[in-house]
């Protein structure tokens, strides 16, 4: 009797396209210093110019190449959003794991904290805090980590609640293993895909939020290559030089959409795998 072959499902075209976009952005972020060593260099004699052979996306009013600004801006936007997603994921796991596994007052305390944070408009709070404390990219990242962490906490807690009474957990409990060992060595590996899928979604939200703060002058300093800052610097040139405004806006939208598509796809795969167990 032949064993049925395992069906390998290929990702849809939208996911492949999203992964291609993310790969291009990652390459730009990683190799920006070599690809565009002088992205912020000004040529006041050139000034505003439309797309052409030497400048595929044109130049802004300071004579800076818009495409080079986008490539260099990826090196600021991507690591910043990645730090927010990773930081909030770390806090979410540290709080959500014991909340879901131990329950009781630990769970109640964690959920009250999450409810309090969810009652606050994240971007508005980030704008107020950054404005009061003087702004800065590092501060913006730190504030968003704290504001995004409750989402990860709830996702991790929910995943742990689904795993808490599985046979492998009960077997580990019968061996008198410590709660910490069970959570970290047995439960967490089974919920890691869920946490990772949620991190992709947080990555997208963080990218847009950091760009918004930079657009308002509360993120990277003036003159620094960043998608939000480039959009802000050229917003008054929409009619005279639309590409200088459209290009960074499209970069933000395309990257955030790609992250959302991949995150949703990962969620679907993780959820499907959980139902078939």
Describe the predicted segments one by one.
Residues 31-35, 80-115, 127:
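Transmembrane-helix boundary motif in ABC transporter permease subunits
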Residues 75-91, 126, 180-212, 259:
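Transmembrane alpha-helices
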Residues 1-39, 113, 191-192:
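N-terminal signal-anchor/first transmembrane alpha helix
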Residues 56, 60, 101, 106, ...:
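Generic hydrophobic transmembrane alpha-helix motif, especially the helices
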Residues 59-64, 101-102, 161, 171-190, ...:
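Short helix-to-coil transition segments within interhelical loops
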Residues 147, 193, 197-201, 242-277:
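C-terminal transmembrane helix and the adjacent membrane-cytosol boundary/short C-terminal tail
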């Amino acid at each position: 009797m032949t064993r049925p072959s395992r069906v390998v499902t290929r990702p849809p075209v939208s996911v492949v396209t999203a992964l291609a976009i993310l790969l291009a952005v990652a390459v730009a972020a990683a190799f920006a210093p070599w690809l565009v060593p002088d992205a912020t260099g000004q040529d006041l004699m050139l000034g505003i110019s439309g797309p052409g052979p030497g400048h595929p996306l044109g130049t802004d009013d300071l004579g800076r190449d818009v495409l080079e600004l986008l490539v260099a801006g990826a090196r600021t936007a991507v690591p910043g959003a990645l730090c927010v997603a990773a930081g909030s994921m770390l806090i979410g796991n540290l709080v959500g794991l014991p909340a879901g596994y131990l329950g009781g007052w630990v769970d109640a305390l964690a959920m009250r904290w999450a409810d309090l944070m969810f009652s606050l408009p994240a971007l508005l709070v980030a704008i107020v805090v950054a404005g009061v404390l003087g702004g800065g990219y590092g501060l913006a990242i730190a504030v968003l980590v704290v504001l995004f962490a409750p989402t990860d906490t709830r996702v991790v807690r929910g995943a742990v609640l689904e795993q808490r009474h599985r046979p492998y957990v009960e077997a580990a409990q019968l061996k008198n293993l410590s709660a910490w060992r069970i959570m970290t060595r047995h439960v967490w590996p089974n919920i890691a895909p869920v946490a990772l899928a949620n991190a992709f979604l947080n990555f997208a939200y963080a990218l847009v939020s950091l760009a918004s703060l930079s657009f308002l002058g509360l993120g990277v300093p003036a003159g620094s290559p960043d998608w939000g800052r480039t959009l802000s610097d050229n917003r008054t040139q929409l009619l005279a030089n639309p590409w200088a405004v459209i290009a960074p806006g499209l970069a933000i939208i395309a990257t955030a959409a790609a992250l959302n598509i991949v995150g949703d796809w990962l969620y679907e795969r993780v959820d499907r795998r959980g139902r078939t167990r």
